[in-house]
Amino acid sequence: MLYVLVNITMNPTISKSQYVRGLQCEKALWLFRNRKDLLLEPSSATKNILEIGNLIGKLAMDNYPTGIEVTTEYWDINGAIKATKKYIDDGNDIIFEATALHPITGAYSKIDILKRVDNTDLWDLIEVKSSTKVKEYHKDDLAFQYYVFSNSGYKIRNSYMMLIDNSYERIGDIDPTKILRLIDISEQVKNKQNEVNRITLELCNSLTETGEPKEKIGEKCFKPFECDFKSYCWKHVPDYSIY
């Protein structure tokens, strides 16, 4: 039997996307939580990337026709956790957007695909990305998800990235079973757990501050993504700057 923590008294504190944002810059995370009025409108290129991501996500789900999706409102974390547990209790072995919350730090996560290992109480985590190779921030992303799920009662066997297979040749309709491939990054994910715990605590602590953190601008404003608070932080930088 799976003993998943459902009746959580800890309030949700930080999500996976917020964790990844905080890794890039603590100030960006603080602004995201406290000054969303400063966010840049997403560019057409960003919107296109999101659309492609949604398409790849749908293809990934098509690989698992018996899967069931958690469809609670995005802000209803406790509702999503309870729905996930109900689907498991009902005997579902594949759950899309399965949700868990760390009982101590309040970190929470929605995994793209939670898949039971056949005839066991073990589970695999599968994170889907519209990329052809594993990037460092993908490892951080999945390491955070492992951190949340493994500490909330799930026995995790393996952690996978599901990526685009660039050797796939399309003939007719896209075959979802061939255009995507699984890459096992379980060891890298496990090796990051102490780091994830430390950084999560640091980020949660920084979010309690009343003023924005002091951060220097520079290369990190562009890697792994161009920050959507760049116009705010760079407002005093002249056009001829080396940046």
Describe every region a protein language model picked out.
Residues M1-N119, D239-Y243:
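Metal-dependent nuclease catalytic cores that hydrolyze phosphodiester bonds in DNA/RNA
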Residues D93, D112, L122-D124, R157-Y160:
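Beta-sheet entry/capping signal
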Residues A98-H102, K115-V117, K129-T132, L163, ...:
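Short, flexible loop/turn elements at secondary-structure junctions
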Residues N48, I52, L101, T105, ...:
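Conserved aromatic-histidine-acidic binding/catalytic patches
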Residues D140-V148:
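Short amphipathic alpha-helical face segments that pack within enzyme cores
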Residues K133-E136, V148-K230, H236:
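Metal-dependent nuclease catalytic regions and adjoining charged, substrate-binding loops involved
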Residues A107-D140:
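Non-catalytic protein-protein interaction segments used by genome-maintenance enzymes to assemble
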